[in-house]
Protein backbone atom coordinates (compact mmCIF):
# COMPACT_ATOMS: atom_id res chain seq x y z
CA UNK A 1 0.00 0.00 0.00
CA UNK A 2 1.53 3.36 -0.96
CA UNK A 3 2.14 5.69 1.93
CA UNK A 4 2.93 9.38 1.53
CA UNK A 5 5.97 10.92 3.16
CA UNK A 6 5.39 12.79 6.41
CA UNK A 7 5.07 16.52 5.77
CA UNK A 8 7.81 18.83 6.96
CA UNK A 9 7.17 20.53 10.26
CA UNK A 10 6.94 23.95 8.67
CA UNK A 11 5.01 22.97 5.56
CA UNK A 12 1.98 25.08 4.70
CA UNK A 13 -1.36 24.33 3.12
CA UNK A 14 -1.30 23.60 -0.58
CA UNK A 15 -3.81 25.51 -2.75
CA UNK A 16 -5.94 22.39 -3.25
CA UNK A 17 -6.04 21.65 0.46
CA UNK A 18 -6.83 25.26 1.25
CA UNK A 19 -9.72 25.21 -1.19
CA UNK A 20 -11.17 21.99 0.22
CA UNK A 21 -11.07 23.36 3.76
CA UNK A 22 -11.94 26.98 3.00
CA UNK A 23 -15.07 27.11 5.19
CA UNK A 24 -13.05 26.23 8.30
CA UNK A 25 -10.53 28.89 7.40
CA UNK A 26 -13.37 31.36 7.04
CA UNK A 27 -14.67 30.37 10.48
CA UNK A 28 -11.24 30.72 12.04
CA UNK A 29 -10.72 34.10 10.41
CA UNK A 30 -14.15 35.20 11.60
CA UNK A 31 -13.27 34.46 15.22
CA UNK A 32 -9.85 36.07 14.95
CA UNK A 33 -11.25 39.18 13.29
CA UNK A 34 -13.96 39.54 15.91
CA UNK A 35 -11.30 39.48 18.61
CA UNK A 36 -9.22 42.03 16.71
CA UNK A 37 -12.23 44.33 16.37
CA UNK A 38 -13.25 43.96 20.00
CA UNK A 39 -16.40 41.96 19.25
CA UNK A 40 -17.12 39.21 21.77
CA UNK A 41 -16.99 35.63 20.39
CA UNK A 42 -20.29 35.07 22.22
CA UNK A 43 -21.88 37.59 19.85
CA UNK A 44 -20.17 36.18 16.75
CA UNK A 45 -20.88 32.50 17.48
CA UNK A 46 -24.61 32.49 16.59
CA UNK A 47 -23.88 33.95 13.16
CA UNK A 48 -21.33 31.23 12.46
CA UNK A 49 -23.56 28.28 13.42
CA UNK A 50 -25.45 28.02 10.08
CA UNK A 51 -22.17 28.15 8.14
CA UNK A 52 -20.64 25.44 10.30
CA UNK A 53 -23.64 23.13 10.13
CA UNK A 54 -23.92 23.53 6.35
CA UNK A 55 -20.30 22.54 5.98
CA UNK A 56 -20.80 19.70 8.46
CA UNK A 57 -23.59 18.14 6.39
CA UNK A 58 -21.74 18.58 3.10
CA UNK A 59 -18.40 17.31 4.38
CA UNK A 60 -19.90 14.29 6.15
CA UNK A 61 -22.08 13.35 3.17
CA UNK A 62 -19.12 13.46 0.77
CA UNK A 63 -16.64 11.72 3.09
CA UNK A 64 -15.01 8.82 1.25
CA UNK A 65 -11.88 7.70 3.14
CA UNK A 66 -8.80 6.98 1.00
CA UNK A 67 -7.06 4.19 2.89
CA UNK A 68 -4.42 3.78 0.17
CA UNK A 69 -2.94 7.24 0.80
CA UNK A 70 -2.23 7.94 4.46
CA UNK A 71 -1.61 11.66 4.06
CA UNK A 72 -4.81 12.14 2.08
CA UNK A 73 -6.68 10.11 4.70
CA UNK A 74 -5.24 12.32 7.44
CA UNK A 75 -6.42 15.46 5.66
CA UNK A 76 -9.88 13.95 5.20
CA UNK A 77 -10.28 12.96 8.84
CA UNK A 78 -8.69 16.23 9.97
CA UNK A 79 -11.60 18.04 8.37
CA UNK A 80 -14.05 15.98 10.44
CA UNK A 81 -12.10 16.56 13.64
CA UNK A 82 -11.93 20.31 13.01
CA UNK A 83 -15.68 20.50 12.49
CA UNK A 84 -16.26 18.50 15.67
CA UNK A 85 -13.95 20.76 17.68
CA UNK A 86 -15.63 23.89 16.37
CA UNK A 87 -19.02 22.36 17.17
CA UNK A 88 -17.93 21.86 20.78
CA UNK A 89 -16.73 25.45 20.93
CA UNK A 90 -20.01 26.93 19.74
CA UNK A 91 -22.02 24.76 22.12
CA UNK A 92 -20.36 26.62 25.01
CA UNK A 93 -22.26 29.81 24.09
CA UNK A 94 -25.88 30.73 24.83
CA UNK A 95 -27.73 29.83 21.63
CA UNK A 96 -31.35 29.63 20.56
CA UNK A 97 -33.22 26.33 20.49
CA UNK A 98 -33.02 26.35 16.68
CA UNK A 99 -29.25 26.82 16.78
CA UNK A 100 -28.85 24.02 19.32
CA UNK A 101 -30.90 21.78 17.04
CA UNK A 102 -28.60 22.60 14.10
CA UNK A 103 -25.55 21.67 16.16
CA UNK A 104 -27.22 18.45 17.33
CA UNK A 105 -27.90 17.44 13.73
CA UNK A 106 -24.26 18.14 12.92
CA UNK A 107 -23.14 16.04 15.88
CA UNK A 108 -25.29 13.11 14.76
CA UNK A 109 -23.99 13.43 11.21
CA UNK A 110 -20.38 13.38 12.41
CA UNK A 111 -21.07 10.37 14.65
CA UNK A 112 -22.53 8.42 11.73
CA UNK A 113 -19.55 9.32 9.56
CA UNK A 114 -17.03 8.20 12.18
CA UNK A 115 -19.03 5.02 12.71
CA UNK A 116 -18.70 4.22 9.00
CA UNK A 117 -14.99 5.04 9.11
CA UNK A 118 -14.24 2.78 12.09
CA UNK A 119 -16.28 -0.06 10.55
CA UNK A 120 -14.27 -0.12 7.30
CA UNK A 121 -12.35 -3.42 6.85
CA UNK A 122 -9.59 -1.45 5.11
CA UNK A 123 -8.86 0.32 8.40
CA UNK A 124 -7.78 -2.97 9.97
CA UNK A 125 -5.29 -3.54 7.16
CA UNK A 126 -3.98 0.00 7.50
CA UNK A 127 -3.37 -0.24 11.24
CA UNK A 128 -1.70 -3.62 10.80
CA UNK A 129 0.81 -2.10 8.38
CA UNK A 130 1.36 0.98 10.52
CA UNK A 131 2.07 -1.18 13.57
CA UNK A 132 4.97 -2.77 11.68
CA UNK A 133 6.49 0.57 10.68
CA UNK A 134 9.65 1.82 12.40
CA UNK A 135 8.41 5.42 12.52
CA UNK A 136 7.23 6.19 16.09
CA UNK A 137 4.61 8.69 14.88
CA UNK A 138 3.02 5.98 12.72
CA UNK A 139 3.15 3.41 15.51
CA UNK A 140 1.44 5.90 17.80
CA UNK A 141 -1.25 6.53 15.19
CA UNK A 142 -1.82 2.79 14.76
CA UNK A 143 -2.17 2.34 18.51
CA UNK A 144 -4.87 5.00 18.62
CA UNK A 145 -6.78 3.63 15.65
CA UNK A 146 -6.67 0.15 17.18
CA UNK A 147 -7.99 1.52 20.46
CA UNK A 148 -10.84 3.38 18.75
CA UNK A 149 -11.86 0.23 16.89
CA UNK A 150 -11.75 -1.80 20.10
CA UNK A 151 -13.93 0.72 21.95
CA UNK A 152 -16.30 1.16 19.02
CA UNK A 153 -19.95 0.31 19.59
CA UNK A 154 -22.47 -0.41 16.87
CA UNK A 155 -25.04 2.23 15.99
CA UNK A 156 -27.83 0.48 17.91
CA UNK A 157 -25.75 -0.11 21.05
CA UNK A 158 -24.39 3.43 20.95
CA UNK A 159 -27.89 4.87 20.63
CA UNK A 160 -29.10 2.84 23.61
CA UNK A 161 -26.08 3.86 25.69
CA UNK A 162 -26.38 7.56 24.90
CA UNK A 163 -30.13 7.45 25.48
CA UNK A 164 -29.67 5.89 28.91
CA UNK A 165 -26.95 8.39 29.83
CA UNK A 166 -29.16 11.29 28.75
CA UNK A 167 -32.04 9.90 30.83
CA UNK A 168 -29.80 9.74 33.88
CA UNK A 169 -28.69 13.34 33.48
CA UNK A 170 -32.27 14.45 32.99
CA UNK A 171 -33.40 12.43 35.99
CA UNK A 172 -31.06 14.31 38.29
CA UNK A 173 -31.93 17.80 37.15
CA UNK A 174 -35.70 17.44 36.93
CA UNK A 175 -37.50 20.29 38.65
CA UNK A 176 -40.02 18.02 40.33
CA UNK A 177 -37.45 16.23 42.50
CA UNK A 178 -38.57 17.25 45.98
CA UNK A 179 -37.62 16.41 49.53
CA UNK A 180 -40.08 16.12 52.39
CA UNK A 181 -38.20 17.97 55.13
CA UNK A 182 -40.88 17.67 57.79
CA UNK A 183 -39.65 18.84 61.18
CA UNK A 184 -36.22 19.50 59.68
CA UNK A 185 -37.52 22.29 57.42
CA UNK A 186 -36.09 25.79 57.65
CA UNK A 187 -38.11 28.94 56.95
CA UNK A 188 -37.66 30.48 53.50
CA UNK A 189 -36.03 27.43 51.88
CA UNK A 190 -38.43 27.59 48.95
CA UNK A 191 -36.77 30.81 47.78
CA UNK A 192 -33.93 30.75 45.25
CA UNK A 193 -30.46 31.58 46.53
CA UNK A 194 -27.75 33.50 44.74
CA UNK A 195 -25.32 30.96 43.19
CA UNK A 196 -22.52 33.53 43.37
CA UNK A 197 -22.65 33.64 47.17
CA UNK A 198 -20.84 31.18 49.44
CA UNK A 199 -19.24 29.58 46.38
CA UNK A 200 -16.67 27.61 48.37
CA UNK A 201 -19.33 26.17 50.64
CA UNK A 202 -21.67 25.35 47.76
CA UNK A 203 -19.00 23.62 45.70
CA UNK A 204 -17.95 21.53 48.67
CA UNK A 205 -21.51 20.52 49.52
CA UNK A 206 -22.91 19.93 46.04
CA UNK A 207 -22.79 16.74 44.04
CA UNK A 208 -20.92 16.40 40.74
CA UNK A 209 -23.69 18.01 38.73
CA UNK A 210 -23.76 21.68 37.83
CA UNK A 211 -25.57 23.63 40.54
CA UNK A 212 -29.22 24.21 39.86
CA UNK A 213 -31.97 25.66 42.03
CA UNK A 214 -32.32 22.57 44.19
CA UNK A 215 -28.57 21.93 44.58
CA UNK A 216 -28.00 25.52 45.67
CA UNK A 217 -30.76 25.17 48.26
CA UNK A 218 -29.32 21.94 49.64
CA UNK A 219 -25.90 23.57 50.03
CA UNK A 220 -27.45 26.52 51.83
CA UNK A 221 -29.58 24.22 53.99
CA UNK A 222 -26.51 22.37 55.25
CA UNK A 223 -24.92 25.70 56.12
CA UNK A 224 -27.95 27.00 58.01
CA UNK A 225 -29.26 23.90 59.79
CA UNK A 226 -27.93 23.73 63.36
CA UNK A 227 -29.31 20.24 64.05
CA UNK A 228 -26.73 17.62 63.00
CA UNK A 229 -29.35 14.85 62.85
CA UNK A 230 -31.44 16.92 60.43
CA UNK A 231 -28.39 17.67 58.31
CA UNK A 232 -27.58 13.96 58.12
CA UNK A 233 -31.16 13.00 57.25
CA UNK A 234 -31.54 15.61 54.52
CA UNK A 235 -28.10 14.96 53.03
CA UNK A 236 -28.71 11.21 52.81
CA UNK A 237 -32.16 11.72 51.32
CA UNK A 238 -30.76 14.13 48.76
CA UNK A 239 -28.09 11.65 47.65
CA UNK A 240 -30.79 9.07 46.90
CA UNK A 241 -33.20 11.56 45.32
CA UNK A 242 -33.04 10.08 41.81
CA UNK A 243 -33.08 6.37 42.64
CA UNK A 244 -36.54 5.65 41.20
CA UNK A 245 -35.94 7.72 38.07
CA UNK A 246 -32.47 6.41 37.28
CA UNK A 247 -32.65 2.77 38.31
CA UNK A 248 -33.78 1.55 34.88
CA UNK A 249 -31.44 3.66 32.67
CA UNK A 250 -28.44 2.94 34.91
CA UNK A 251 -29.21 -0.78 34.74
CA UNK A 252 -29.20 -0.41 30.94
CA UNK A 253 -25.75 1.21 31.07
CA UNK A 254 -24.43 -1.61 33.26
CA UNK A 255 -25.87 -4.26 30.92
CA UNK A 256 -24.48 -2.63 27.76
CA UNK A 257 -21.03 -2.24 29.26
CA UNK A 258 -21.05 -5.82 30.54
CA UNK A 259 -22.04 -7.00 27.07
CA UNK A 260 -19.15 -5.01 25.59
CA UNK A 261 -16.69 -6.58 28.05
CA UNK A 262 -17.93 -10.11 27.37
CA UNK A 263 -17.53 -9.55 23.62
CA UNK A 264 -13.83 -8.90 24.21
CA UNK A 265 -13.35 -11.82 26.59
CA UNK A 266 -13.34 -9.97 29.93
CA UNK A 267 -15.39 -10.92 33.00
CA UNK A 268 -16.47 -7.33 33.69
CA UNK A 269 -16.39 -3.87 32.18
CA UNK A 270 -13.95 -2.77 34.89
CA UNK A 271 -11.53 -5.49 33.79
CA UNK A 272 -12.00 -4.58 30.12
CA UNK A 273 -11.58 -0.80 30.28
CA UNK A 274 -8.68 -0.99 32.75
CA UNK A 275 -6.74 -3.59 30.76
CA UNK A 276 -5.09 -0.88 28.64
CA UNK A 277 -4.32 1.54 31.49
CA UNK A 278 -1.24 2.15 33.65
CA UNK A 279 -3.37 0.81 36.49
CA UNK A 280 -4.36 -2.22 34.45
CA UNK A 281 -6.56 -4.17 36.88
CA UNK A 282 -9.33 -3.34 39.37
CA UNK A 283 -6.97 -4.33 42.19
CA UNK A 284 -4.38 -1.79 40.94
CA UNK A 285 -6.99 0.97 41.04
CA UNK A 286 -8.15 -0.15 44.48
CA UNK A 287 -4.57 -0.01 45.81
CA UNK A 288 -4.22 3.55 44.52
CA UNK A 289 -7.57 4.61 45.99
CA UNK A 290 -6.77 3.01 49.34
CA UNK A 291 -3.43 4.84 49.37
CA UNK A 292 -5.31 8.09 48.68
CA UNK A 293 -7.85 7.53 51.46
CA UNK A 294 -7.55 9.79 54.48
CA UNK A 295 -10.31 9.82 57.05
CA UNK A 296 -11.70 13.25 57.80
CA UNK A 297 -12.91 14.03 61.31
CA UNK A 298 -16.35 15.15 60.13
CA UNK A 299 -19.19 13.80 57.98
CA UNK A 300 -20.18 15.39 54.63
CA UNK A 301 -23.34 16.84 56.15
CA UNK A 302 -21.25 18.57 58.84
CA UNK A 303 -18.91 20.30 56.41
CA UNK A 304 -20.95 23.52 56.44
CA UNK A 305 -20.37 24.34 60.12
CA UNK A 306 -16.68 23.46 59.71
CA UNK A 307 -16.38 25.95 56.85
CA UNK A 308 -18.23 28.64 58.76
CA UNK A 309 -15.71 28.45 61.58
CA UNK A 310 -12.68 28.70 59.27
CA UNK A 311 -11.12 31.78 57.67
CA UNK A 312 -10.60 32.28 53.94
CA UNK A 313 -7.10 32.29 52.47
CA UNK A 314 -6.01 35.88 51.94
CA UNK A 315 -4.82 36.71 48.43
CA UNK A 316 -3.39 39.70 46.57
CA UNK A 317 -5.86 41.04 44.00
CA UNK A 318 -4.47 41.43 40.47
CA UNK A 319 -5.96 42.31 37.12
CA UNK A 320 -6.47 39.47 34.69
CA UNK A 321 -3.91 41.06 32.35
CA UNK A 322 -1.34 41.19 35.17
CA UNK A 323 -1.89 37.53 35.96
CA UNK A 324 -1.51 36.61 32.29
CA UNK A 325 1.77 38.54 32.03
CA UNK A 326 3.17 36.84 35.13
CA UNK A 327 2.24 33.43 33.76
CA UNK A 328 3.79 34.05 30.34
CA UNK A 329 6.96 35.37 32.00
CA UNK A 330 7.14 32.05 33.83
CA UNK A 331 6.68 30.16 30.55
CA UNK A 332 9.79 31.71 28.98
CA UNK A 333 12.25 29.21 30.55
CA UNK A 334 10.27 26.48 28.77
CA UNK A 335 11.03 28.10 25.41
CA UNK A 336 7.54 29.57 25.09
CA UNK A 337 7.04 33.16 23.97
CA UNK A 338 4.03 35.23 22.96
CA UNK A 339 3.71 37.83 20.22
CA UNK A 340 1.01 40.33 21.10
CA UNK A 341 -1.12 41.27 18.09
CA UNK A 342 -3.41 43.36 20.28
CA UNK A 343 -4.84 43.21 23.79
CA UNK A 344 -7.08 40.28 22.84
CA UNK A 345 -4.90 38.28 20.48
CA UNK A 346 -1.58 36.49 21.03
CA UNK A 347 0.56 34.27 18.83
CA UNK A 348 2.36 31.59 20.82
CA UNK A 349 5.77 30.19 19.82
CA UNK A 350 7.94 27.37 21.13
CA UNK A 351 11.63 27.90 20.32
CA UNK A 352 10.54 30.07 17.40
CA UNK A 353 8.01 27.60 15.97
CA UNK A 354 4.50 29.00 15.72
CA UNK A 355 2.14 26.85 17.80
CA UNK A 356 -1.00 28.87 17.23
CA UNK A 357 -3.14 31.71 18.44
CA UNK A 358 -4.57 32.50 21.84
CA UNK A 359 -7.65 34.72 21.85
CA UNK A 360 -8.18 36.56 25.15
CA UNK A 361 -11.63 37.58 26.39
CA UNK A 362 -13.25 38.59 29.68
CA UNK A 363 -15.90 36.59 31.50
CA UNK A 364 -17.36 35.78 34.90
CA UNK A 365 -15.24 32.64 35.20
CA UNK A 366 -11.74 31.69 34.07
CA UNK A 367 -11.86 28.97 31.43
CA UNK A 368 -10.25 27.63 28.28
CA UNK A 369 -12.09 26.89 25.05
CA UNK A 370 -10.44 25.06 22.18
CA UNK A 371 -11.25 26.14 18.63
CA UNK A 372 -8.69 24.17 16.63
CA UNK A 373 -6.08 21.63 17.70
CA UNK A 374 -2.47 22.07 16.58
CA UNK A 375 -1.07 19.32 14.32
CA UNK A 376 2.58 19.65 13.27
CA UNK A 377 2.89 20.14 9.53
CA UNK A 378 -0.87 20.38 9.06
CA UNK A 379 -2.27 23.31 11.05
CA UNK A 380 -1.53 25.59 13.95
CA UNK A 381 -3.84 25.63 16.94
CA UNK A 382 -6.33 28.18 18.15
CA UNK A 383 -7.78 28.60 21.64
CA UNK A 384 -9.76 31.13 23.59
CA UNK A 385 -8.69 32.01 27.12
CA UNK A 386 -11.46 33.59 29.18
CA UNK A 387 -10.23 35.52 32.23
CA UNK A 388 -12.03 37.40 34.96
CA UNK A 389 -11.18 41.13 34.96
CA UNK A 390 -9.97 40.82 38.56
CA UNK A 391 -8.35 37.77 40.14
CA UNK A 392 -9.23 38.05 43.83
CA UNK A 393 -9.72 34.65 45.45
CA UNK A 394 -7.42 31.66 45.60
CA UNK A 395 -9.76 29.80 43.27
CA UNK A 396 -9.45 32.63 40.73
CA UNK A 397 -5.71 32.14 40.54
CA UNK A 398 -5.97 28.36 40.47
CA UNK A 399 -8.49 28.36 37.62
CA UNK A 400 -6.47 30.96 35.68
CA UNK A 401 -3.43 28.69 35.92
CA UNK A 402 -5.47 25.62 34.97
CA UNK A 403 -7.07 27.38 31.99
CA UNK A 404 -3.79 28.64 30.54
CA UNK A 405 -2.20 25.22 31.13
CA UNK A 406 -5.00 23.61 29.12
CA UNK A 407 -4.50 26.12 26.30
CA UNK A 408 -0.72 25.59 26.18
CA UNK A 409 -1.14 21.80 26.31
CA UNK A 410 -3.56 21.96 23.39
CA UNK A 411 -1.21 24.14 21.32
CA UNK A 412 2.08 22.40 22.05
CA UNK A 413 1.54 18.76 21.07
CA UNK A 414 4.30 17.53 18.76
CA UNK A 415 2.25 14.90 16.93
CA UNK A 416 2.08 14.94 13.12
CA UNK A 417 -1.34 13.33 13.16
CA UNK A 418 -4.45 14.69 14.85
CA UNK A 419 -5.08 11.58 16.95
CA UNK A 420 -1.50 11.59 18.26
CA UNK A 421 -2.19 14.97 19.88
CA UNK A 422 -5.83 14.56 20.86
CA UNK A 423 -5.93 11.00 22.22
CA UNK A 424 -3.34 10.21 24.87
CA UNK A 425 -2.94 6.51 25.61
CA UNK A 426 -3.19 5.01 28.08
CA UNK A 427 -6.06 7.18 29.23
CA UNK A 428 -4.74 7.42 32.79
CA UNK A 429 -1.56 8.92 31.32
CA UNK A 430 -3.53 11.64 29.56
CA UNK A 431 -3.59 14.99 31.30
CA UNK A 432 -0.43 14.30 33.30
CA UNK A 433 1.55 16.83 31.25
CA UNK A 434 -1.12 19.50 31.74
CA UNK A 435 -1.27 18.75 35.47
CA UNK A 436 2.53 19.06 35.71
CA UNK A 437 2.36 22.41 33.88
CA UNK A 438 -0.27 23.61 36.37
CA UNK A 439 2.11 22.87 39.21
CA UNK A 440 4.94 24.63 37.38
CA UNK A 441 2.86 27.74 36.65
CA UNK A 442 1.61 27.87 40.23
CA UNK A 443 5.12 29.08 41.12
CA UNK A 444 4.76 32.14 38.86
CA UNK A 445 3.78 34.44 41.70
CA UNK A 446 5.59 35.76 44.75
CA UNK A 447 2.85 34.23 46.89
CA UNK A 448 1.73 30.63 47.18
CA UNK A 449 -1.32 29.24 45.41
CA UNK A 450 -1.82 26.68 48.14
CA UNK A 451 -4.58 27.21 50.71
CA UNK A 452 -3.55 28.48 54.11
CA UNK A 453 -3.47 25.76 56.80
CA UNK A 454 -6.89 25.34 58.38
CA UNK A 455 -8.53 27.70 55.89
CA UNK A 456 -11.91 27.23 54.23
CA UNK A 457 -10.14 26.44 50.99
CA UNK A 458 -8.03 23.73 52.59
CA UNK A 459 -11.08 22.14 54.21
CA UNK A 460 -12.97 22.26 50.91
CA UNK A 461 -10.03 20.74 49.00
CA UNK A 462 -9.64 17.92 51.54
CA UNK A 463 -13.36 17.21 51.39
CA UNK A 464 -13.46 17.21 47.59
CA UNK A 465 -10.44 14.90 47.51
CA UNK A 466 -12.07 12.31 49.75
CA UNK A 467 -15.42 12.64 48.00
CA UNK A 468 -13.68 11.85 44.69
CA UNK A 469 -11.90 8.89 46.28
CA UNK A 470 -15.20 7.52 47.54
CA UNK A 471 -16.93 8.11 44.20
CA UNK A 472 -14.11 6.32 42.39
CA UNK A 473 -14.60 3.31 44.68
CA UNK A 474 -18.35 3.31 43.95
CA UNK A 475 -17.76 3.56 40.20
CA UNK A 476 -15.16 0.79 40.20
CA UNK A 477 -17.36 -1.57 42.22
CA UNK A 478 -20.48 -0.85 40.16
CA UNK A 479 -18.93 -2.21 36.95
CA UNK A 480 -17.19 -5.26 38.44
CA UNK A 481 -18.43 -8.82 38.11
CA UNK A 482 -20.95 -9.92 40.73
CA UNK A 483 -19.21 -11.47 43.72
CA UNK A 484 -15.77 -10.20 42.68
CA UNK A 485 -15.84 -6.57 43.83
CA UNK A 486 -12.89 -4.69 45.31
CA UNK A 487 -15.39 -2.91 47.57
CA UNK A 488 -18.22 -5.33 48.40
CA UNK A 489 -19.24 -3.22 51.41
CA UNK A 490 -19.52 0.36 50.22
CA UNK A 491 -20.58 1.62 53.64
CA UNK A 492 -17.10 0.73 54.88
CA UNK A 493 -15.56 2.63 51.97
CA UNK A 494 -17.61 5.65 53.01
CA UNK A 495 -16.59 5.32 56.65
CA UNK A 496 -12.91 5.09 55.62
CA UNK A 497 -13.08 8.68 54.33
CA UNK A 498 -15.69 10.33 56.55
CA UNK A 499 -16.63 10.39 60.22
CA UNK A 500 -20.17 9.15 59.82
CA UNK A 501 -22.30 6.25 58.67
CA UNK A 502 -24.54 5.91 55.64
CA UNK A 503 -26.79 2.84 55.72
CA UNK A 504 -28.37 3.68 52.33
CA UNK A 505 -25.01 4.09 50.57
CA UNK A 506 -26.16 1.89 47.67
CA UNK A 507 -28.45 4.77 46.63
CA UNK A 508 -25.47 6.92 45.70
CA UNK A 509 -24.84 5.44 42.27
CA UNK A 510 -28.26 6.69 41.11
CA UNK A 511 -27.48 10.33 41.92
CA UNK A 512 -23.84 10.29 40.81
CA UNK A 513 -23.98 11.36 37.16
CA UNK A 514 -20.37 10.66 36.21
CA UNK A 515 -20.81 6.96 36.96
CA UNK A 516 -22.66 6.41 33.68
CA UNK A 517 -20.26 8.51 31.59
CA UNK A 518 -16.85 7.68 33.07
CA UNK A 519 -17.56 4.40 34.82
CA UNK A 520 -14.47 2.73 36.33
CA UNK A 521 -12.29 5.50 34.86
CA UNK A 522 -13.64 8.05 37.32
CA UNK A 523 -10.32 7.73 39.17
CA UNK A 524 -8.48 9.39 36.25
CA UNK A 525 -8.61 12.95 37.57
CA UNK A 526 -7.26 11.93 40.97
CA UNK A 527 -4.58 9.73 39.46
CA UNK A 528 -3.34 12.28 36.94
CA UNK A 529 -3.01 15.00 39.58
CA UNK A 530 -1.21 12.67 41.98
CA UNK A 531 1.12 11.31 39.29
CA UNK A 532 1.96 14.86 38.14
CA UNK A 533 2.76 15.73 41.75
CA UNK A 534 5.09 12.73 42.01
CA UNK A 535 6.85 13.79 38.79
CA UNK A 536 7.15 17.38 40.03
CA UNK A 537 8.61 16.40 43.40
CA UNK A 538 10.99 13.83 41.88
CA UNK A 539 12.31 16.19 39.18
CA UNK A 540 12.80 19.48 41.03
CA UNK A 541 16.46 19.34 39.99
CA UNK A 542 15.60 19.06 36.29
CA UNK A 543 15.47 21.91 33.83
CA UNK A 544 11.70 22.39 33.39
CA UNK A 545 12.21 22.87 29.64
CA UNK A 546 13.25 19.20 29.45
CA UNK A 547 10.12 18.14 31.27
CA UNK A 548 7.91 20.30 29.07
CA UNK A 549 9.39 18.70 25.95
CA UNK A 550 8.99 15.22 27.40
CA UNK A 551 5.51 15.49 28.89
CA UNK A 552 3.72 17.90 26.55
CA UNK A 553 5.55 18.25 23.22
CA UNK A 554 6.77 14.65 22.86
CA UNK A 555 7.83 15.14 19.24
CA UNK A 556 9.46 11.70 19.25
CA UNK A 557 6.05 10.12 20.03
CA UNK A 558 7.34 8.13 23.00
CA UNK A 559 4.65 6.08 24.75
CA UNK A 560 3.74 7.30 28.22
CA UNK A 561 5.21 4.15 29.78
CA UNK A 562 8.61 4.90 28.22
CA UNK A 563 8.49 8.51 29.41
CA UNK A 564 7.64 7.45 32.95
CA UNK A 565 10.44 4.90 32.87
CA UNK A 566 12.90 7.66 31.99
CA UNK A 567 11.73 9.53 35.09
CA UNK A 568 11.24 6.75 37.64
CA UNK A 569 13.22 3.81 36.25
CA UNK A 570 10.06 1.68 36.12
CA UNK A 571 6.42 2.34 35.30
CA UNK A 572 4.54 -0.62 36.77
CA UNK A 573 1.57 0.12 38.98
CA UNK A 574 3.33 -0.73 42.24
CA UNK A 575 6.26 1.60 41.46
CA UNK A 576 4.03 4.50 40.45
CA UNK A 577 1.83 4.16 43.55
CA UNK A 578 4.96 4.07 45.73
CA UNK A 579 6.28 7.22 44.02
CA UNK A 580 2.96 8.94 44.71
CA UNK A 581 3.13 7.95 48.38
CA UNK A 582 6.70 9.26 48.61
CA UNK A 583 5.72 12.57 46.99
CA UNK A 584 3.05 13.14 49.62
CA UNK A 585 5.67 12.93 52.38
CA UNK A 586 8.53 14.68 50.54
CA UNK A 587 6.65 17.49 48.78
CA UNK A 588 8.57 20.33 50.39
CA UNK A 589 12.01 18.75 50.04
CA UNK A 590 14.28 20.12 47.32
CA UNK A 591 16.68 18.08 45.21
CA UNK A 592 19.62 19.03 43.03
CA UNK A 593 19.61 15.86 40.93
CA UNK A 594 17.70 15.00 37.77
CA UNK A 595 16.92 11.47 36.54
CA UNK A 596 16.70 12.49 32.87
CA UNK A 597 19.65 11.62 30.61
CA UNK A 598 21.54 14.65 29.31
CA UNK A 599 20.12 16.88 32.04
CA UNK A 600 21.66 20.28 32.68
CA UNK A 601 24.03 19.74 35.59
CA UNK A 602 24.26 23.51 36.12
CA UNK A 603 20.53 23.91 36.63
CA UNK A 604 20.08 25.03 40.26
CA UNK A 605 16.71 23.38 40.80
CA UNK A 606 13.26 24.91 40.95
CA UNK A 607 12.14 26.68 44.09
CA UNK A 608 8.58 27.17 45.27
CA UNK A 609 7.21 30.46 46.61
CA UNK A 610 7.39 30.91 50.36
CA UNK A 611 4.79 28.89 52.22
CA UNK A 612 2.22 30.54 54.42
Where are these predicted regions, by residue range?
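N-terminal secretory signal peptides that target proteins for export/translocation
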Residues: 1-19
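Metalloprotease/metallohydrolase-associated module, dominated by Zn2+-dependent proteases
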Residues: 294, 424-504, 612
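Structured, charged N-terminal subsegments at the starts of enzyme catalytic cores
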Residues: 166-304
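N-terminal helix-rich structural modules
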Residues: 27-33, 41-201, 514, 520, ...
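Active-site recognition of the HExxH zinc-binding catalytic motif
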Residues: 386-414
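Generic, well-ordered alpha-helical scaffold segments in large soluble proteins
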Residues: 237, 252-263, 272-275, 288-295, ...
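Active-site-proximal, well-structured secondary-structure segments within enzyme catalytic domains
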Residues: 211, 225-226, 250-385, 443-448, ...
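C-terminal, non-catalytic "cap/extension" segments appended to globular domains
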Residues: 43-46, 335, 408, 472-612
